C-alpha cells in the first residue's frame, strides 16, 4: 500500500482501452487532415468504431484531442527514428525519416492554428517536448550517417535539416508543398554525401 498522501500507482490501461485510444488518434488525424480541426468529433468516433462517450473518456475536449494527435505524431516520428536506425543503412534511414518528417509537417500545419489558440503554457510545453523528441531523433540518424562516413559533418547541425524542410512547408502555400519538401529531402541528402 502506498504511504498516506502519495499518489496511487497508475495502472497500465487495458489493452482494449489503449487500442481504442490509438484508433481515435488515427481517426482524428485523418479527419483533421480532410476537414480541419473543426471536423465532427462524432465522425471521428464513428471512424474509430467507438461511441462518442469513449472519445470523451479519452479526450475530454477537442483541444485535448488536438494536442494528443500532435503529441502522438511527434512520438511516432521519434520511435520511427530508432526503428530505422536498427533496420536500415545510415543514409537510407536518414532519408526515410526525413520523408516521414514531411508527413508529420502535414499534420502539424493542420493543427498549428488550434495549437496556437490553446493556453499558452500548455502549447509551449507541448511544442518543447515534441521539439526535443524531433531533435533527438534527427541527431541520432545524422550521427549514424556521419559516423559511417556517408555524409560530411562539416558544420552540420541536425536541426538545420529540419528547418530547411519546414521552411519549404511554411513558405509553400501551394497545394503541392509536400512534393517540394520531398524534393528538398533529396537535395539535402545529395548535398551532404561525401
Annotate each language-model stretch with its function:
Residues 128-130, 146-163, 174-180:
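All-alpha amphipathic helical-bundle segments outside canonical DNA-binding/catalytic cores
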Residues 1-47, 64-67:
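Basic, helix-initiating cap at the start of DNA-binding domains
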Residues 1-8, 135-148, 171-194:
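C-terminal peripheral helix-coil segments that are non-catalytic and often amphipathic
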Residues 66-73, 108:
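Alpha-helical DNA-contacting segments of helix-turn-helix folds
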Residues 68, 82-106, 135:
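Hydrophobic alpha-helical connector segments
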Residues 61-66, 77:
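Short amphipathic alpha-helical segment with a characteristic S/N-K-E followed by hydrophobic residues
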Residues 49-59:
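Short hydrophobic/aromatic patch on the recognition helix
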Residues 93-123, 160-163:
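Amphipathic alpha-helical segments used for helix-helix packing
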Amino acid at each position: 500500500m502506498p504511504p498516506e498522501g502519495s499518489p496511487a500507482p497508475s495502472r497500465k490501461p487495458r489493452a482494449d482501452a489503449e487500442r481504442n485510444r490509438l484508433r481515435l488518434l488515427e481517426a482524428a488525424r485523418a479527419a483533421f487532415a480532410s476537414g480541419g480541426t473543426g471536423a465532427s468529433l462524432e465522425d471521428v468516433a464513428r471512424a474509430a468504431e467507438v461511441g462518442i462517450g469513449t472519445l470523451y473518456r479519452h479526450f475530454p475536449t477537442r483541444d485535448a484531442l488536438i494536442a494528443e494527435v500532435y503529441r502522438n505524431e511527434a512520438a511516432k516520428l521519434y520511435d520511427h527514428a530508432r526503428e530505422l536506425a536498427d533496420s536500415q543503412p545510415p543514409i537510407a534511414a536518414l532519408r526515410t525519416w526525413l520523408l516521414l518528417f514531411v508527413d508529420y509537417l502535414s499534420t502539424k500545419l493542420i493543427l498549428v492554428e488550434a495549437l496556437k489558440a490553446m493556453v499558452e503554457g500548455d502549447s509551449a510545453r507541448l511544442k518543447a517536448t515534441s521539439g526535443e523528441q524531433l531533435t533527438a531523433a534527427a541527431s541520432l540518424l545524422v550521427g549514424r550517417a556521419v559516423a559511417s562516413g556517408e555524409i560530411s559533418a562539416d558544420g552540420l547541425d541536425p536541426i538545420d535539416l529540419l528547418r530547411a524542410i519546414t521552411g519549404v512547408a511554411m513558405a509553400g502555400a501551394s497545394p503541392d508543398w509536400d512534393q517540394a519538401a520531398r524534393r528538398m529531402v533529396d537535395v539535402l541528402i545529395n548535398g551532404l554525401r561525401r
